[in-house]
Amino acid sequence: MSKATIELDFLGLEKKQTNNAPKPKFQKFLDRRRSFRDIQGAISKIDPEIIKSLLASTGNNSDSSAKSRSVPSTPREDQPQIPISPVHASLARSSTELVSGTVPMTIFYNGSVSVFQVSRNKAGEIMKVANEAASKKDESSMETDLSVILPTTLRPKLFGQNLEGDLPIARRKSLQRFLEKRKERLVSTSPYYPTSA
């Protein structure tokens, strides 16, 4: 039983020509731009893993003759025959990653992006080291924050009560009068200030 080759036009490049009348040059230019835009739109919707596998499979056929390149090749067993939707793409990627043994690891650091191919064990170790370093940094920042906060909270003094020695006597008395008047104003304008009966 022979296998029939079926070619599907996923990109929609082969449009049916209804009229065979010659087109003006400008119309040909517009059609060319439209078809290029259609190709870009279709390629942007395809899963990147499928494109990579297609490019890899065409790279393997580069030693064959030009005659065999014009005929569509039959898909191999390990390649998906139908494009996988993005929802199921993670399932397909995980199976290919298990075979290869390495996974891409993207690191964002100091404004730069780096991608490395590392094994799963190595990626886990890197993540563990990064988490430990981040937790140590958080603990050290908490210790410094507490050292700044605790001395001020251990001294529960109101503003204006510890003015001896900092200012000259005239300023000190003036500032104390100002703070007393301010305190009276705040108390008198509070919503729960008891009115005299």
Swiss-Prot record:
Keyword hit for Nucleotide-binding: no
Region (Disordered): 57-84
Sequence ranges of Polar residues compositional bias: 57-73
Signal peptide: none
Pfam families named in the record: Jas_motif, tify
Effect ascribed to mutating G111A: Loss of dimerization and loss of interaction with TIFY11B/JAZ6
Protein name, per record: Protein TIFY 9
Subunit and interaction comment: Homo- and heterodimer. Interacts with MYC2, MYC3, MYC4, AFPH2/NINJA, TIFY10A/JAZ1, TIFY10B/JAZ2, TIFY6B/JAZ3, TIFY6A/JAZ4, TIFY11B/JAZ6, TIFY5A/JAZ8, TIFY7/JAZ9, TIFY3A/JAZ11 and TIFY3B/JAZ12. Isoform 1 and isoform 2 interact with COI1. Isoform 3 does not interact with COI1. Interacts with RHD6 and RSL1.
Chain's gene name: TIFY9
Induction: Up-regulated by jasmonate, wounding and herbivory.
Localization in the cell: Nucleus
PROSITE patterns: TIFY
Keywords annotated in UniProt: Jasmonic acid signaling pathway, Nucleus, Plant defense, Transcription, Transcription regulation, Ubl conjugation
InterPro entries per the UniProt record, alphabetical: CCT_CS, TIFY/JAZ, Tify_dom
Keyword Disulfide bond recorded: no
Record remark on domains: The tify domain is required for dimerization. The jas domain (168-193) is required for interaction with COI1.
PTM field: Ubiquitinated. Targeted for degradation by the SCF(COI1) E3 ubiquitin ligase-proteasome pathway during jasmonate signaling.
Positions of the Tify domain: 98-132
GO function term, MF aspect, one: protein homodimerization activity
Similarity field: Belongs to the TIFY/JAZ family.
